[in-house]
């Protein structure tokens, strides 16, 4: 499970595509946290409703032209995933 989560972290680090970056963070965090994902994300300052809206938007619009979570929120999720993998 940890190796799979690390692969998602690597995808995030090597991508400039918003949709791919967000989904890689979501997938890595979901592997490690399951249903606790949103609670832990909120502890890092990422609003659960905004997170869910961002995921919904990506599913509805593969173009990914609109950014719902800003770079600061993506970095918070990245930090959460990184810390879980180094703990």
Regions found by a protein language model. Give the residues of each.
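Amphipathic, oligomerization/interface secondary-structure segments
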Residues: 1-87
């Amino acid at each position: 499970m940890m190796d799979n989560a690390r692969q998602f972290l690597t995808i995030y680090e090597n991508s400039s595509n918003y949709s791919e970056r967000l989904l890689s963070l979501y997938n890595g965090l979901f592997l490690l946290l399951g249903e606790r994902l949103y609670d832990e994300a909120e502890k890092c300052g990422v609003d659960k409703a905004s997170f869910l809206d961002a995921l919904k938007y990506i599913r509805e619009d593969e173009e990914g032209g609109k950014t719902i979570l800003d770079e600061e929120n993506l970095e918070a999720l990245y930090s959460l995933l990184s810390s879980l993998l180094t703990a």
